[in-house]
């Protein structure tokens, strides 16, 4: 009998609550965001129903949907924004009846910025980063906030085979910024699937994904894993051309670990609002290339006869301003690695990904009991139900799946329904 080994992996940085509804009825709009100059789909575009905290993001194909209360007026405004582009505002009535096959095409226009180079150089990049971090309490909520979020995680083998896929609506008690309190997270409802077969000799299990996605909140956690007073000892900074997000100008600072450091740190970019000095976005990658010891950061348990090499580890976290404060809005983590059994010439390539979109928030946080909290040691697969219901999400906003993922979900639902009828 062929033995199947197990690999347990976590996406670490080095080491919604679901509102009760009196009625399930909702209305829905669909759109596709593209670059107005090139026609290419735009990932991570932010879509918000003005005057509310209801929001979502576009997927890799630019597609999004947004659910809202049926009593919302048809002339209510929807804003669509993306870093480096002018924000566009539409009416709900502009979208027409919901049609996922023919969504409204929304073209965002790139915004170029011409600044005096001397003005850019006037901002010392290291001082700019420190100024932004020192202003965390002024720019982010300093009290508990309740949030609703959609979360998705998956493990993929090669380019097409999804080994596991889990999705959930989360209840979140977001802890105050500038405090040492931890965010509390609970699963309101979720679904998942595993797709291993007799050809798979390695089970890749993803532990702590929900907790880890909150640990990359760079406005709350130590910046790139180092304390405030150590930043300039570990990192070097460089000013980059500024960008616009709608009508907001953002300073851009790139960073990388200093040469000669033995430990693995990060490189990336920080986007800082020019008026408030709030951190609006962070894009970063762990410097794992060519480092055999990178596996020790991510792998919790692995078979002794298997070599593990981390190829890349990428992170994105985005914030959005609401009434003078900036809120955790979207985050994504993705690690790519390859494995090879001892004395084997063949390699297997894997991708582990998780992403979260905050779809609503309010001042009163949910009560999440200790026994219901998601903990780092938890595996989402063990906490969610199967993909049996095509209308599983009801009136909750979710990140629309890319076409390849959507096809997988449809297939899973069909297979499970067929199995239940047998």
Please provide the spans of the model-predicted regions.
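Surface-exposed, low-complexity/disordered segments
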Residues: 89, 99-234, 246-249, 298-299, ...
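A short, solvent-exposed loop/turn motif at the edges and junctions
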Residues: 77-90
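Hydrophobic beta-strand segments
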Residues: 39, 45-49, 62, 78, ...
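Short, acidic Ser/Thr/Gly-rich low-complexity loop/linker segments typical of extracellular
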Residues: 53-63
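Short Pro-Gly-centered beta-turn/loop motif in secreted/extracellular proteins
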Residues: 66-74
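Sec-dependent N-terminal signal peptides
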Residues: 4-15
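Structural motif
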Residues: 24-42
């Amino acid at each position: 009998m062929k033995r199947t080994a197990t690999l347990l992996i976590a996406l670490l940085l080095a080491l919604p609550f679901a509102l009760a509804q009196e009625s399930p009825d909702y209305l829905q709009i669909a759109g596709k965001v593209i670059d107005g100059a090139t026609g290419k789909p735009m990932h991570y575009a932010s879509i918000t129903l003005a005057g509310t905290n209801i929001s979502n993001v576009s997927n890799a194909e630019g597609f999004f949907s947004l659910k809202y209360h049926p009593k919302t007026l048809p002339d209510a405004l929807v804003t669509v924004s993306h870093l480096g582009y002018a924000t566009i505002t539409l009416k709900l009535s502009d979208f027409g009846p919901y049609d996922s096959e023919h969504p409204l095409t929304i073209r965002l226009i790139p915004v170029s910025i011409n600044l005096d180079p001397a003005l850019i150089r006037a901002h010392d990049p290291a001082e700019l980063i420190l100024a932004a971090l020192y202003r965390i309490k002024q720019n982010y909520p300093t009290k508990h906030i309740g949030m609703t979020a959609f979360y998705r995680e998956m493990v993929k083998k090669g380019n097409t085979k999804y080994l596991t896929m889990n999705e959930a609506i989360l209840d979140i008690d977001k802890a105050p910024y500038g405090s040492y309190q931890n965010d509390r997270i609970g699963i309101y409802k979720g679904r998942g699937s595993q797709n291993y077969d007799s050809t798979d000799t390695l089970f890749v299990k993803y532990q702590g994904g929900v907790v880890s996605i909150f640990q990359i909140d760079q406005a709350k956690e130590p910046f790139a894993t180092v304390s405030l007073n150590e930043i300039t000892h570990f990192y070097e900074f460089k000013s980059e051309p500024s960008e616009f997000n709608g009508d907001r100008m953002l300073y851009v600072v790139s960073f990388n670990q200093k040469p000669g450091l033995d430990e693995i740190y990060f490189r990336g970019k920080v986007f800082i609002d020019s008026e408030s000095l709030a951190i609006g976005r962070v894009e970063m990658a762990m410097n794992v290339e060519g480092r055999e010891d990178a596996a020790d950061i991510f792998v919790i348990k692995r078979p002794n006869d298997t070599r593990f090499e981390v190829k890349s580890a990428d992170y994105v976290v985005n914030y959005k301003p609401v009434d003078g404060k900036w809120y955790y809005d979207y985050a994504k983590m993705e690690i790519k690695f390859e494995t090879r059994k001892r004395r084997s010439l063949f390699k297997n390539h894997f991708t582990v990904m998780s992403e979260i979109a905050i779809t609503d928030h309010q001042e009163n946080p949910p009560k999440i009991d200790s026994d219901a909290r998601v903990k780092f040691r938890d595996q989402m697969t063990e906490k969610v139900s199967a993909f049996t219901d095509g209308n599983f999400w009801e009136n909750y906003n979710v990140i629309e799946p890319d076409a390849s993922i959507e096809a997988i979900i449809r297939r899973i639902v069909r297979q499970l329904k067929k199995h239940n009828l047998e």
